[in-house]
């Protein structure tokens, strides 16, 4: 007699990482660190009053059904730069959607720079990403999210897939910025439209929320001249949108813009070209 084998759920990558910082003797110091599953956080040495955190997905990428949760709390007066060890790769999904959720709280006179490296979407991948940020009235926040539709140098094309990116940025409980991006099914055809990406396969959004938004605008606009994109500032926030033919071209522009929004400070070392 033959017995049918019971269906088994493929093993999925899951992880949760939490970082909290406090101000001690004029420097940003670790208050809490928690890491679980595929989520790891490393804290390289810094030579100023700030803290740098490098978040790592030890699974090496994400596919349908994987889930990562990150949270960051910057206490009063602290400064934290958060980046990733490498580009996050989103692979073909046989079933389900990968999920990445990030929660950031920035306290009084504190600043967080959320600077992950690019996310690479492969053909038939599926990702839902969510960023929730709560800012104190006096806090500053800088975020960049860059997307590559495959790797152009490898001849990769993303014909179809699913990508949802949702941002909710609040200051003192009041919503000040929202993003709701969705790419689905005919991704290549959608990206080819002039009103979307005009055939470009690398794109990014940068957001700065803080008292220097309007002042930064004059520094940023000359840096994006000649590129596909633009910059605007209003109501205490600055938004930059960019698109490029490939990831290398995009990164060259991003490094200049990010540095300008950090008062000339360089990007984290893992970002170097």
Swiss-Prot record:
GO terms for cellular component: cytoplasm. Pfam families: UreD. Keywords: Chaperone, Cytoplasm, Nickel insertion. GO terms for molecular function: nickel cation binding. It is found in: Cytoplasm. HAMAP family: UreD. Belongs to the UreD family. UreD, UreF and UreG form a complex that acts as a GTP-hydrolysis-dependent molecular chaperone, activating the urease apoprotein by helping to assemble the nickel containing metallocenter of UreC. The UreE protein probably delivers the nickel. Required for maturation of urease via the functional incorporation of the urease nickel metallocenter. This is Urease accessory protein UreD. It comes from Rhizobium leguminosarum bv. trifolii (strain WSM2304). The gene is ureD.
């Amino acid at each position: 007699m033959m017995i049918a084998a019971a269906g088994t759920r493929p093993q999925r990558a899951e992880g949760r990482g939490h970082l909290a910082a406090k101000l001690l003797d004029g420097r940003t110091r670790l208050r809490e660190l928690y890491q679980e599953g595929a989520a790891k956080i490393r804290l390289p040495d810094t030579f100023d009053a700030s803290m740098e955190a490098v978040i790592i997905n030890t699974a090496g990428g994400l596919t349908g059904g994987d889930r990562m949760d990150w949270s960051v709390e910057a206490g009063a007066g602290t400064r934290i730069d958060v980046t990733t060890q490498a580009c996050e790769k989103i692979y073909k999904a046989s079933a389900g959607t990968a999920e990445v959720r990030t929660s950031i709280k920035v306290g009084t006179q504190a600043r967080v720079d959320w600077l992950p490296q690019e996310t690479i979407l492969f053909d038939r991948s599926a990702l839902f990403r969510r960023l929730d940020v709560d800012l104190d009235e006096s806090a500053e926040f800088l975020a960049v999210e860059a997307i590559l539709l495959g790797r152009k140098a490898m001849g990769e094309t993303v014909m179809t897939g699913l990508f949802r990116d949702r941002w909710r940025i609040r200051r003192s409980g009041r919503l000040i910025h929202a993003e709701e991006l969705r790419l689905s099914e005919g991704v290549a055809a959608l990206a080819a439209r002039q009103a979307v990406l005009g055939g470009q396969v690398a794109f990014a959004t940068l957001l700065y929320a803080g008292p220097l938004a309007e002042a930064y605008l004059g520094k940023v606009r000359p840096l994006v001249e000649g590129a596909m994109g633009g910059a605007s500032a209003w109501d205490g926030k600055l938004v930059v949108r960019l698109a490029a033919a490939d990831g290398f071209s995009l990164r060259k522009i991003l490094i200049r813009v990010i540095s300008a929004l950090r008062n000339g400070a360089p990007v984290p070392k893992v970002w170097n070209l």
